[in-house]
Amino acid sequence: MQGLSFTFSAVTLFLVLCLQLGIIESQDDENVRKPLLIEIDVPSTAQENQEITVQVTVETQYRECMVIKAYLVSNEPMEGAFNYVQTRCLCNDHPIRFFWDIIITRTVTFATVIDIVREKNICPNDMAVVPITANRYYTYNTVRMN
């Protein structure tokens, strides 16, 4: 009977070890799909009154589509295309490029903001997801005037 008890203990220990390894592997951040991957192309310097283009490329690792809004926010008042809010449907394997042409009159720091939103009539058949963890992504850029 004592040998049977030892066998159960060894089996139990082995199962606990397997479960622990499985849990740790499932929590690995490298295997988690990212809702948004953002690449920003903006010059770091510009001449006074020079028009520059801010280009933002957004893609997703999700299999489902999502509705995203992209816009720029600045510490200084800006005019024109800088204030445009662009809304698009983002799907896997189809990156989206947003463009803003802005005129630099002084050194400016701005945020590029991407919101994942619930909005109808953007994605086909209104089939889109919104992640539970986060729905706003942003990054800061500075364009210095020469």
From Swiss-Prot:
Disulfide bonds join 65-91, 89-123. Residues 1-26 form the signal peptide. Pfam families: SVA. GO terms for biological process: regulation of immune system process. It is found in: Secreted. Keywords: Disulfide bond, Pyrrolidone carboxylic acid, Secreted, Signal. The modification Pyrrolidone carboxylic acid is found at residue 27. Lacrimal and submaxillary glands. Gene3D superfamilies: Immunoglobulins. Its main location: secreted. GO terms for cellular component: apical plasma membrane; extracellular region. The keyword Signal applies. Belongs to the PIP family. Monomer. Interacts with AZGP1. PANTHER family: PROLACTIN-INDUCIBLE PROTEIN, PROLACTIN-INDUCIBLE PROTEIN/SEMINAL VESICLE ANTIGEN. This is Prolactin-inducible protein homolog. It comes from Mus musculus (Mouse). The gene is Pip.
